[in-house]
């Protein structure tokens, strides 16, 4: 993880809280899930072995804060520009990250830590700054959402569902599950 020192300074090591590790945390996981998790376990075991767990979490948090500051600079500049009223900003990641949960340090799982992503949309006249929505959605919704926000018609057979109703009102009932896929044939479905 790379970030200027001032972002590391936001997270003193003595204040870093480590995730709880359960001795039998994988006991209820099917063999396929345990096998997937085992492929990347060496990285986490190495971090623990060398006493770098808190430092690794600190670096992760510093990187997030650094990225957040840069996004803030971009949005502040946009707010001061002539393009503020006709620019849609979409920011997302393709995966989340485990910080030791389930003895895992990486992405590459179908658990919450790896499937929950940052996902922000700022659309003039549609979204309100600081609004959050607890509904599960997936990245297949980005393209149809942008089409609707731009007043364009979707092509037939397009995957995904526009989330414009949620952008307008996060309390809108939502029955469409979020689907996450990792490698071929390994999926997770998340709904309310």
For each of these PLM feature ranges, what is it?
Residues 1-136, 149-156:
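Active-site-proximal cap/lid insertion segments
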């Amino acid at each position: 993880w790379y970030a200027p020192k001032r972002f590391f300074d936001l997270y003193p090591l003595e204040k870093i809280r480590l995730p709880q590790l359960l001795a039998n945390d994988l006991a209820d996981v099917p063999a396929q899930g345990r096998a997937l998790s085992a492929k990347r376990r060496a990285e986490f075991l190495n971090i623990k072995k060398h006493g770098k767990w808190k430092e690794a979490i600190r670096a992760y948090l510093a990187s997030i804060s650094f990225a957040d500051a840069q996004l803030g600079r971009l949005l502040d500049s946009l707010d001061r520009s002539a393009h503020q009223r006709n620019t849609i900003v979409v920011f997302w990641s393709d995966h989340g990250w485990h910080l030791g949960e389930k003895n895992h340090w990486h992405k590459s799982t179908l658990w919450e830590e790896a499937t929950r992503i940052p996902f922000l949309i700022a659309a003039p006249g549609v979204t309100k700054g600081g609004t959050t929505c607890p509904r599960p959605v997936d990245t297949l919704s980005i393209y149809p959402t942008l089409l609707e926000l731009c007043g364009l018609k979707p092509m037939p057979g397009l995957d995904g569902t526009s989330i414009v109703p949620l952008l307008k009102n996060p309390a809108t009932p939502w029955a469409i599950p979020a689907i996450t896929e990792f490698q071929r044939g390994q999926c997770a479905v998340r709904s309310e």
